[in-house]
Amino acid sequence: MVYRLKDDVEEISNIRLGYTGRFVDDSFKATEYNLTVEHASDFPSLDGFSLDDYYNRDNLSSGWFKIQKNVDKYTVTKNIHSAYAEATYQFTPRWIVNLGLKYDYVDINVDYNVNRGGSEGSNTIRKDYFLPSLNLKYNLNEKHSLRLGASKTYTLPQAKEISPYRYVGVNFNSQGNPNLKPSDNYNFDLKWDFNPSPTELVSLTAFYKHIKDPISRIEVASAGGYLSYENISDRATVAGVEVEIRKNLFVRPLSCAANGMNKLSFGLNG
């Protein structure tokens, strides 16, 4: 829902109100079959041994080995309700301000019975998030502008990160952690934009992020050795600089573009 506001400049000022919902159901099931030798002393020599010669229907009926079936499964239900309000106002030809406030209600439920019944239970994450944001834009002239942004966001654990199912791969094993907490992120950035033409851009951004309860993959010291996920500290910080360039290498008039191509552009981001 958008309400237009009157300003004395470009009349881009407005207020937006809205709601979004995200509803996700993730389910996982892994079936494992274990073939166990019943008479180990009578097991044939490994010289010239063939699995098909031993593990077959006749030997199963004769009791030479048995088959054990195990099913590991988990489900993750994620419901997120979001309501937001956002206001944009252009005070002068140079100054534009955008203010926003978003409310999220997060409800995540994990049910699991994994690792041959060794890990069975459930876990719930229910949280309210109030997420403010502020964006300021100052037009130095027609081609140069400065932007300042500040916001709060959050990062939720993925389904595989909060289920204790142990995945056995060729090169590594990994297991989720049902006790993971979401991370809170406080973001700040300052950006300079230069537009040599309407389709070209040179941009330089300095950013800073403060993270509460950051989530990371770790290696667990154990006899088997596996990877898992943890809130590795109370807080963490990330800072850096980003450069983006979009440049037209050549532009041809439409009358000269017989093959339909009238522009070739180059882009760089790093």
Where are these regions (language model features)?
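Short sequence motifs at beta-strands and strand-loop junctions characteristic
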Residues: 25, 73-79, 124-129, 180-184, ...
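Short secondary-structure boundary/capping segments
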Residues: 32-36, 114-116, 163-166, 220-221
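Surface-exposed extracellular loop regions of Gram-negative outer-membrane beta-barrel proteins
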Residues: 62, 107, 142-187, 203-229
